[in-house]
Amino acid sequence: MKDQSGKDSIINIADSIDLRKPIKLKVWSTEALAGTSPDQTREYTISVRVHKHDPDSLRWNYVANISNSESIKEQKTVILGENILTYSVVDNVLKVYIAQKGNAMSWVSNSLEENPFKNSLPSSILSYNNKLYATTADNNDGNVYESTNGIKWETSGLFENEHVNLLLAPLSNKITYIKTINETKVFASTNEITSNAKTDQELQVVPDDFPIGNISYTTYTTATGLEGIMLIGEHAKQPIAGDIEAIVPWGYMGSIWVSFPPNNEETSCPVLQTPTIMYYNNQFYIFGEKFESFYTSEAGLAWKKANKKFSFPYQDWSEADFKPSKEQPEFRGRETYSSVLDDKNDYIYILFSGGTASFEEEVEDEEDEEKSSKATKTHTYTYESEVWRGRLNQLWFDKDPLNAGK
């Protein structure tokens, strides 16, 4: 190692070393030290990279507005190949807004061709084998419709002679769904259609406490290589855990659907409006409107609030006249949204419909001179039809170790 004059010096490991810049170390063999083989040396360069971002935190970035001219309302979003597609009813017309995952700053509005959905959102929509599959809101005919681009739709032959009520979730080799047989709703999958693996009498009957709509699902692979589905949604009667209404996930490991009711109120996920479930960094997460926090679980049974580092953007409102911006974003209080997970790049996309957000926050009571009591303050702000994406910093570091964290 060079000293201040540029000459070689011997390192004393008890000394402190400045590692803010790369340093060169020269290692001498015993022969080189003895002078018998002076060329038997080797040089090493040590460079220590210090991340400027906490690896356990979510990093959020504003991407774009879905539309600057159209008012986006209730929406459903899905990924097809390298594209993100968001469906929304605008001025009583169903439209799809499309952007590339690699260029989500640019969104193109499209009217649907051969539109079977009329002026309503699909009741269920998913991506499987480079196609989209969806059911209509009224679904009187029990048909499923398919599309290769999200714009032009036609009746799907994959579900021929089936009366499908609702699509649930895809795995690598099949789509799971609910169908009606002799006025009874049962669980089924597309590989059972093609292989006749089960007779109608062998299919699992859909229980009364299974979600009836607004399905959110996530897929995952276990340590042993088994594919699974975890699913949540709207219930005819919301489940109860102790004294609170709770979200009860349903799981599927290739054969039957099983509920995951919480053991008690303390380990339950409280009911949320329009909840979303995702499997991210080997954990299950649930969040919903108002965007107060994530709830997390290792196996889908016991839930708790996620670490504060794994959170949505929030700001300090103590300054007078503070208003959120794209540079200082605030998610609390927001409502109508949709979300998709880009598994390839580990991005969590959240797409908002524009609106006015309002939330309450506990602050110090200004009238309390001793500052020992709390008061509740309401904050209100407006936001646009925005696209945001977040990623855990550690996953960012892993994908780009040379540049991440800078």
Where are the predicted features?
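Short beta-strand elements that form the blades of beta-propeller/WD-repeat-like
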Residues: 75-90, 124-138, 166-186, 219-240, ...
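Blade-level signature of beta-propeller repeat domains, shared across WD40, Kelch, NHL, RCC1
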Residues: 327-406
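Repeated scaffold domains used in trafficking and secretory/extracellular systems
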Residues: 65-81, 114-130, 155-175, 202-226, ...
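Beta-propeller blade signature
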Residues: 95-102, 142-152, 184-195, 242-254, ...
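A generic tandem-repeat structural signature
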Residues: 102-196
